[in-house]
Structures are given as C-alpha cells and as structure tokens.
Amino acid sequence: MAYPFQLGLQDATSPIMEELLHFHDHTLMIVFLISSLVLYIITLMLTTKLTHTSTMDAQEVETVWTILPAIILVLIALPSLRILYMMDEINNPSLTVKTMGHQWYWSYEYTDYEDLNFDSYMIPTQELKPGELRLLEVDNRVVLPMEMTIRMLISSEDVLHSWAVPSLGLKTDAIPGRLNQTTLMAMRPGLYYGQCSEICGSNHSFMPIVLEMVPLSYFETWSALMV
C-alpha cells in the first residue's frame, strides 16, 4: 500500500506490476536523457557568442532530428506493447471471480462455487478499530489464493466504475452492459488495497477494495466455511 509522502510507485506484488515498474524506469531514463540534452543545448545557446545568420538550411540536422525521435518512440513502444499483450493473456485460470460495481459498493461472486457471493462495503470511520485504515477497510474482504492465476470478470449495475489495485498493477473499467476481464497473481500473502478509480457519484471516494491473498490451504478452509 502507499505511505504518506511516498514519491515512487507501490511495491510490486504481481509479475505484471514488476514489468510495469521496469517499464517506468526504462521510460524515465529516456525522458531524463532527453531533458538533459535539451537543457545542455539551451545553456549553449544562451552562453555562446557565435551566431549563424548566414545559415539558410541544414539538411543533416533535419535528418537527425527526424530519425532520432522515431527511434526513441520505438524504444518506448516495444516494451509497452509487450506488457500490453501480457496483461491481455489469460491461460487456464485456477479461479474466476465476478465483480460488480454499485453506487457505492462492490459485490463479488466466486463462479466456481455454487453459493459463494457477498457485498463489500466500506467501514465507516467511527466504526474503525485501532490500526485499521480510514476509507480503505471493508466489512468483507476478497480472499484469494496466492501464486495462482485468477480471472476477474468486472462489470457494473449502474454507472461507470473502475476496479483498481495499484500494487498488483490492476485497473479495469466496470461498464454497465459490458463484461471486462483481467487476471491477477500475487507472489506473496498479505492485504492489498485499492479503490474505485472512476468518478461515479457523490460517494465515489467510499468504494475501497481489499484483497486478502492467502495460501491455498487457508483459502480452501475459508471457502468451505463461506459456502
């Protein structure tokens, strides 16, 4: 989860988020190099006493500043497309969970079980226990097995919502009448927090998401008690 005054992204918990962090660093380095070059050129222009009033054209320079940006764009686009295809790839998920957005709560249905579904509401501030997080705790957490591929089917009952968990690299729109899907895999156990990331009305800020990633044996025990 995020911490006060945090400058970087949240710690990666899934392979997709790790790839996104690498891509972020890759792109940031390119931006840093370009910015340094531009700043250097501006400094030279402001400090040099040389002028080129007789220069009418520079074909070589124009060629360079046409080809070089194209190469830079390719260097950014190729890893981006690779991650995009990775995010869309769904191979033999071990579990499927259907998520529906409502004003202003989430409902979950484990489609591999006959009667395992529940609603997840935010716990009001006045009901929080010591150590719990304001605006992020829910009455029913989504318990999922770690180190397994899980498919999330996401839609909405009313208006546009967006189901997002930053530490897993997830953000999928919940659109009425449309069923979107995404996959997740957590590499370690723990609680992972998210929120609705699409403005959906007056209580948009009160739609938290809490995933509890646990070992498979614990998940099987929990699901048996819930059914």
UniProtKB/Swiss-Prot annotation:
Entry keyword set: Copper, Electron transport, Magnesium, Membrane, Metal-binding, Mitochondrion, Mitochondrion inner membrane, Phosphoprotein, Respiratory chain, Translocase, Transmembrane, Transmembrane helix, Transport
Cofactor, how bound (note): Binds a dinuclear copper A center per subunit.
EC id: 7.1.1.9
Domain of life from the UniProt record: Eukaryota
Transport is among the record's keywords: yes
Main location: mitochondrion
Membrane topology field: Multi-pass membrane protein
GO cellular component terms attached to this protein's record: mitochondrial inner membrane; respiratory chain complex IV
Regions crossing the membrane: 15-45, 60-87
Locations listed in the record: Mitochondrion inner membrane
Catalytic activity: 4 Fe(II)-[cytochrome c] + O2 + 8 H(+)(in) = 4 Fe(III)-[cytochrome c] + 2 H2O + 4 H(+)(out)
Disulfide bonds: none
Assembly behavior: Component of the cytochrome c oxidase (complex IV, CIV), a multisubunit enzyme composed of 14 subunits. The complex is composed of a catalytic core of 3 subunits MT-CO1, MT-CO2 and MT-CO3, encoded in the mitochondrial DNA, and 11 supernumerary subunits COX4I, COX5A, COX5B, COX6A, COX6B, COX6C, COX7A, COX7B, COX7C, COX8 and NDUFA4, which are encoded in the nuclear genome.
Family statement: Belongs to the cytochrome c oxidase subunit 2 family.
Protein name (record): Cytochrome c oxidase subunit 2
Organism: Vulpes zerda (Fennec fox)
Source species taxonomy: Eukaryota, Metazoa, Chordata, Craniata, Vertebrata
